[in-house]
Amino acid sequence: SDSKIGDGCFGLPLDHIGSVSGLGCNRPVQNRPKQIPGGS
């Protein structure tokens, strides 16, 4: 149920990128650096 905490949006852990709750859903984070200074 808590896919947001473990998988984020496309299956990557939040810890790996820092935060996929925002840019993770919109674009591949593996190609984009973490632009979010938090997680919102």
From Swiss-Prot:
It is found in: Secreted. Disulfide bonds join C9-C25. The keyword Glycoprotein does not apply. Its main location: secreted. Keywords: Disulfide bond, Hypotensive agent, Secreted, Toxin, Vasoactive, Vasodilator. Residues 36-40 form a propeptide. Pfam families: ANP. GO terms for molecular function: hormone activity; toxin activity. This is Natriuretic peptide PaNP-b.
